[in-house]
Protein backbone atom coordinates (compact mmCIF):
# COMPACT_ATOMS: atom_id res chain seq x y z
CA UNK A 1 0.00 0.00 0.00
CA UNK A 2 1.38 3.43 -0.90
CA UNK A 3 1.72 6.02 1.85
CA UNK A 4 -1.10 8.53 1.89
CA UNK A 5 -3.55 10.41 4.08
CA UNK A 6 -7.34 10.30 3.66
CA UNK A 7 -9.75 12.93 4.93
CA UNK A 8 -13.46 13.01 5.72
CA UNK A 9 -16.05 15.36 7.20
CA UNK A 10 -19.00 14.16 9.25
CA UNK A 11 -22.23 15.51 10.72
CA UNK A 12 -22.41 18.50 8.38
CA UNK A 13 -18.89 19.69 9.12
CA UNK A 14 -19.00 19.23 12.89
CA UNK A 15 -16.45 16.40 12.88
CA UNK A 16 -13.16 16.28 10.97
CA UNK A 17 -11.49 12.91 10.50
CA UNK A 18 -8.17 11.94 8.92
CA UNK A 19 -6.23 8.68 8.69
CA UNK A 20 -2.86 7.81 7.21
CA UNK A 21 -0.44 5.05 6.31
CA UNK A 22 3.27 5.92 6.54
CA UNK A 23 4.96 2.51 6.36
CA UNK A 24 7.30 3.18 3.45
CA UNK A 25 8.49 6.64 4.42
CA UNK A 26 8.93 5.54 8.02
CA UNK A 27 11.19 2.71 6.85
CA UNK A 28 13.19 5.10 4.67
CA UNK A 29 13.67 7.57 7.51
CA UNK A 30 14.47 4.96 10.16
CA UNK A 31 17.06 3.41 7.82
CA UNK A 32 18.80 6.78 7.42
CA UNK A 33 18.65 7.38 11.17
CA UNK A 34 19.90 3.90 12.06
CA UNK A 35 17.23 3.45 14.70
CA UNK A 36 16.92 0.77 17.35
CA UNK A 37 13.57 -1.07 17.60
CA UNK A 38 12.10 1.29 20.21
CA UNK A 39 13.40 4.35 18.36
CA UNK A 40 11.80 3.04 15.15
CA UNK A 41 8.45 2.67 16.90
CA UNK A 42 8.65 6.14 18.47
CA UNK A 43 9.80 7.85 15.29
CA UNK A 44 7.24 5.99 13.17
CA UNK A 45 4.46 7.16 15.46
CA UNK A 46 5.76 10.73 15.40
CA UNK A 47 5.89 10.75 11.59
CA UNK A 48 2.26 9.65 11.37
CA UNK A 49 1.34 12.12 14.10
CA UNK A 50 2.93 14.97 12.17
CA UNK A 51 1.03 13.98 9.03
CA UNK A 52 -2.25 14.00 10.94
CA UNK A 53 -1.61 17.27 12.79
CA UNK A 54 -0.58 18.89 9.50
CA UNK A 55 -3.48 17.49 7.49
CA UNK A 56 -5.06 20.93 6.90
CA UNK A 57 -1.95 22.65 5.54
CA UNK A 58 -2.30 24.91 2.51
CA UNK A 59 0.30 25.58 -0.20
CA UNK A 60 3.65 26.66 1.22
CA UNK A 61 2.76 25.81 4.83
CA UNK A 62 4.60 23.47 7.20
CA UNK A 63 4.08 21.85 10.60
CA UNK A 64 6.73 20.47 12.96
CA UNK A 65 6.33 18.49 16.17
CA UNK A 66 9.13 18.05 18.69
CA UNK A 67 9.19 15.79 21.75
CA UNK A 68 11.89 16.46 24.33
CA UNK A 69 12.22 14.38 27.47
CA UNK A 70 14.59 12.98 30.02
CA UNK A 71 14.51 9.45 28.62
CA UNK A 72 17.18 7.80 26.46
CA UNK A 73 15.72 9.11 23.16
CA UNK A 74 16.28 12.71 24.37
CA UNK A 75 14.59 14.40 21.39
CA UNK A 76 12.28 13.39 18.56
CA UNK A 77 11.33 15.65 15.62
CA UNK A 78 8.91 15.12 12.73
CA UNK A 79 8.04 17.71 10.09
CA UNK A 80 5.43 17.71 7.32
CA UNK A 81 4.95 20.10 4.41
CA UNK A 82 1.75 21.02 2.59
CA UNK A 83 2.43 18.66 -0.32
CA UNK A 84 2.87 15.55 1.86
CA UNK A 85 6.66 15.63 2.22
CA UNK A 86 7.78 14.35 5.63
CA UNK A 87 11.10 14.09 7.40
CA UNK A 88 12.14 13.17 10.94
CA UNK A 89 15.06 12.64 13.25
CA UNK A 90 15.85 11.30 16.70
CA UNK A 91 18.67 12.55 18.92
CA UNK A 92 19.76 9.11 20.18
CA UNK A 93 18.80 6.59 17.47
CA UNK A 94 20.29 3.56 19.25
CA UNK A 95 18.34 4.18 22.47
CA UNK A 96 17.06 1.15 24.38
CA UNK A 97 13.88 1.13 26.46
CA UNK A 98 10.91 -1.12 27.19
CA UNK A 99 8.27 1.31 25.92
CA UNK A 100 7.90 4.63 24.13
CA UNK A 101 7.00 6.51 27.36
CA UNK A 102 10.12 5.08 28.99
CA UNK A 103 12.17 6.03 25.93
CA UNK A 104 10.91 9.62 25.95
CA UNK A 105 10.86 10.01 29.72
CA UNK A 106 7.93 11.08 31.84
CA UNK A 107 9.10 14.68 32.23
CA UNK A 108 9.51 16.85 29.17
CA UNK A 109 7.80 19.01 26.59
CA UNK A 110 5.92 18.75 23.31
CA UNK A 111 6.37 21.69 20.94
CA UNK A 112 4.22 22.19 17.85
CA UNK A 113 5.26 24.79 15.28
CA UNK A 114 2.92 25.83 12.48
CA UNK A 115 4.51 27.88 9.71
CA UNK A 116 1.48 29.29 7.91
CA UNK A 117 3.38 31.71 5.71
CA UNK A 118 2.90 34.66 8.06
CA UNK A 119 5.69 36.86 9.39
CA UNK A 120 6.42 34.50 12.27
CA UNK A 121 5.50 30.83 12.76
CA UNK A 122 3.05 29.97 15.55
CA UNK A 123 4.60 27.83 18.28
CA UNK A 124 2.74 26.12 21.11
CA UNK A 125 4.21 24.07 23.95
CA UNK A 126 2.80 21.75 26.60
CA UNK A 127 4.35 19.47 29.16
CA UNK A 128 4.33 15.80 28.23
CA UNK A 129 1.02 14.36 29.39
CA UNK A 130 1.62 10.59 29.33
CA UNK A 131 4.67 10.42 27.01
CA UNK A 132 2.52 8.34 24.65
CA UNK A 133 2.86 10.20 21.36
CA UNK A 134 -0.78 9.90 20.27
CA UNK A 135 -2.13 10.89 23.68
CA UNK A 136 0.23 13.84 24.02
CA UNK A 137 -0.63 15.17 20.55
CA UNK A 138 -4.36 14.81 21.24
CA UNK A 139 -3.87 16.58 24.58
CA UNK A 140 -2.01 19.42 22.85
CA UNK A 141 -4.71 19.86 20.20
CA UNK A 142 -7.45 19.81 22.84
CA UNK A 143 -5.71 22.02 25.41
CA UNK A 144 -3.67 24.49 23.34
CA UNK A 145 -5.66 24.72 20.11
CA UNK A 146 -9.04 24.19 21.79
CA UNK A 147 -10.13 21.44 19.38
CA UNK A 148 -11.30 18.30 21.22
CA UNK A 149 -9.32 15.50 19.59
CA UNK A 150 -8.79 11.75 19.69
CA UNK A 151 -5.75 10.20 18.03
CA UNK A 152 -4.51 6.68 17.50
CA UNK A 153 -1.05 5.76 16.23
CA UNK A 154 0.38 2.34 15.53
CA UNK A 155 3.73 0.90 14.46
CA UNK A 156 4.59 -2.78 14.23
CA UNK A 157 8.02 -4.21 13.49
CA UNK A 158 8.83 -7.20 11.32
CA UNK A 159 11.18 -9.95 12.49
CA UNK A 160 14.09 -8.26 10.72
CA UNK A 161 13.52 -5.01 12.62
CA UNK A 162 12.02 -3.12 9.71
CA UNK A 163 8.67 -1.41 10.08
CA UNK A 164 5.91 -3.78 8.96
CA UNK A 165 3.11 -1.21 9.26
CA UNK A 166 2.85 2.40 10.41
CA UNK A 167 -0.16 4.68 10.45
CA UNK A 168 -2.79 6.45 12.49
CA UNK A 169 -6.01 8.43 12.73
CA UNK A 170 -7.23 11.73 14.14
CA UNK A 171 -10.84 12.63 14.97
CA UNK A 172 -11.68 16.25 15.89
CA UNK A 173 -14.91 17.80 17.12
CA UNK A 174 -15.54 21.23 15.60
CA UNK A 175 -17.98 23.84 16.93
CA UNK A 176 -20.87 23.62 17.38
CA UNK A 177 -20.21 20.18 18.84
CA UNK A 178 -22.55 17.25 18.22
CA UNK A 179 -22.15 15.39 21.51
CA UNK A 180 -24.23 12.39 20.43
CA UNK A 181 -22.05 11.82 17.37
CA UNK A 182 -18.87 12.33 19.41
CA UNK A 183 -20.03 9.78 22.00
CA UNK A 184 -20.84 7.27 19.26
CA UNK A 185 -17.41 7.67 17.66
CA UNK A 186 -15.63 7.39 21.01
CA UNK A 187 -17.54 4.17 21.69
CA UNK A 188 -16.43 2.86 18.30
CA UNK A 189 -12.81 3.79 19.07
CA UNK A 190 -13.00 1.98 22.42
CA UNK A 191 -14.06 -1.22 20.64
CA UNK A 192 -11.57 -0.90 17.78
CA UNK A 193 -9.11 -3.78 17.27
CA UNK A 194 -5.44 -2.82 17.64
CA UNK A 195 -4.59 -0.33 14.91
CA UNK A 196 -1.59 -2.38 13.80
CA UNK A 197 -3.88 -5.40 13.32
CA UNK A 198 -6.12 -3.39 11.01
CA UNK A 199 -3.13 -2.10 9.07
CA UNK A 200 -1.62 -5.58 8.74
CA UNK A 201 -4.96 -6.76 7.36
CA UNK A 202 -4.63 -4.20 4.58
CA UNK A 203 -7.16 -1.67 5.88
CA UNK A 204 -6.72 1.54 3.89
CA UNK A 205 -6.95 5.00 5.46
CA UNK A 206 -10.37 5.55 3.85
CA UNK A 207 -11.60 2.19 5.09
CA UNK A 208 -10.32 3.06 8.57
CA UNK A 209 -12.32 6.30 8.48
CA UNK A 210 -15.42 4.39 7.39
CA UNK A 211 -14.95 2.06 10.38
CA UNK A 212 -14.44 4.94 12.82
CA UNK A 213 -17.43 6.87 11.47
CA UNK A 214 -19.78 3.90 11.14
CA UNK A 215 -23.35 4.99 11.84
CA UNK A 216 -22.41 8.66 11.51
CA UNK A 217 -23.21 10.63 8.36
CA UNK A 218 -19.92 11.36 6.63
CA UNK A 219 -18.37 11.90 3.22
CA UNK A 220 -14.79 11.54 1.96
CA UNK A 221 -12.62 14.49 0.98
CA UNK A 222 -9.38 14.57 -1.00
CA UNK A 223 -6.46 12.28 -0.19
CA UNK A 224 -2.78 13.21 -0.41
CA UNK A 225 0.27 11.04 -1.05
CA UNK A 226 2.88 11.07 1.71
CA UNK A 227 6.60 10.64 1.05
CA UNK A 228 10.05 11.29 2.49
CA UNK A 229 11.83 14.44 1.39
CA UNK A 230 14.44 16.26 3.40
CA UNK A 231 14.69 19.66 1.75
CA UNK A 232 18.20 20.44 2.96
CA UNK A 233 20.61 22.05 0.49
CA UNK A 234 24.08 23.53 0.26
CA UNK A 235 22.55 27.00 0.02
CA UNK A 236 20.72 26.50 3.32
CA UNK A 237 23.93 25.32 4.99
CA UNK A 238 25.74 28.38 3.63
CA UNK A 239 23.09 30.60 5.19
CA UNK A 240 23.53 28.77 8.48
CA UNK A 241 27.28 29.35 8.35
CA UNK A 242 26.72 33.03 7.54
CA UNK A 243 24.54 33.29 10.64
CA UNK A 244 27.70 32.65 12.70
CA UNK A 245 28.82 36.17 11.78
CA UNK A 246 32.18 37.31 10.47
CA UNK A 247 33.94 36.68 13.79
CA UNK A 248 32.46 33.18 14.06
CA UNK A 249 33.55 32.29 10.53
CA UNK A 250 37.07 33.63 11.09
CA UNK A 251 37.33 31.61 14.29
CA UNK A 252 36.23 28.48 12.40
CA UNK A 253 38.83 29.14 9.68
CA UNK A 254 41.58 29.63 12.26
CA UNK A 255 40.68 26.65 14.45
CA UNK A 256 39.40 24.10 11.90
CA UNK A 257 40.44 25.31 8.47
CA UNK A 258 37.33 23.78 6.93
CA UNK A 259 33.76 22.83 7.82
CA UNK A 260 31.78 19.62 7.51
CA UNK A 261 28.06 19.92 8.25
CA UNK A 262 25.83 16.83 8.38
CA UNK A 263 22.06 17.19 8.01
CA UNK A 264 20.40 15.67 11.07
CA UNK A 265 17.45 14.48 8.96
CA UNK A 266 18.95 12.81 5.86
CA UNK A 267 22.63 12.55 6.97
CA UNK A 268 23.85 14.30 3.81
CA UNK A 269 27.25 15.88 4.51
CA UNK A 270 28.22 19.27 3.15
CA UNK A 271 31.93 20.15 3.13
CA UNK A 272 33.35 23.66 2.87
CA UNK A 273 37.06 24.16 2.17
CA UNK A 274 39.08 27.02 3.66
CA UNK A 275 38.74 29.09 0.49
CA UNK A 276 34.95 28.75 0.58
CA UNK A 277 34.78 29.79 4.23
CA UNK A 278 37.05 32.75 3.49
CA UNK A 279 34.72 33.79 0.66
CA UNK A 280 31.76 33.64 3.04
CA UNK A 281 33.66 35.72 5.59
CA UNK A 282 34.50 38.35 2.96
CA UNK A 283 30.79 38.70 2.11
CA UNK A 284 30.28 40.71 5.30
Curated annotation (Swiss-Prot):
Belongs to the HSP33 family. Disulfide bonds join 230-232, 263-266. It holds the Pfam family HSP33. One of its GO terms (molecular function) is unfolded protein binding. Redox regulated molecular chaperone. Protects both thermally unfolding and oxidatively damaged proteins from irreversible aggregation. Plays an important role in the bacterial defense system toward oxidative stress. Its main location: cytoplasm. It is found in: Cytoplasm. Keywords: Chaperone, Cytoplasm, Disulfide bond, Redox-active center, Zinc. HAMAP family: HslO. It comes from the Bacteria. InterPro entries: Heat_shock_Hsp33, Heat_shock_Hsp33_C, Heat_shock_Hsp33_N. This is 33 kDa chaperonin. One of its GO terms (cellular component) is cytoplasm. Under oxidizing conditions two disulfide bonds are formed involving the reactive cysteines. Under reducing conditions zinc is bound to the reactive cysteines and the protein is inactive.
Amino acid sequence: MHDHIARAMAVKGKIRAVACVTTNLANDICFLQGTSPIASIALGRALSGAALVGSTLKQGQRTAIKFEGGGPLKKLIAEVEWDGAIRGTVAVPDAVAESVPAALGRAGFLTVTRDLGMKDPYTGMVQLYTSEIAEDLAYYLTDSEQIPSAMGLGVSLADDGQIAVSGGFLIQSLPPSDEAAVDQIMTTISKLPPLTTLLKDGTTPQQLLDILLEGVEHHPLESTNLFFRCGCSRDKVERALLSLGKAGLERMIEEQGEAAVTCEFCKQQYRFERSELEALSRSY
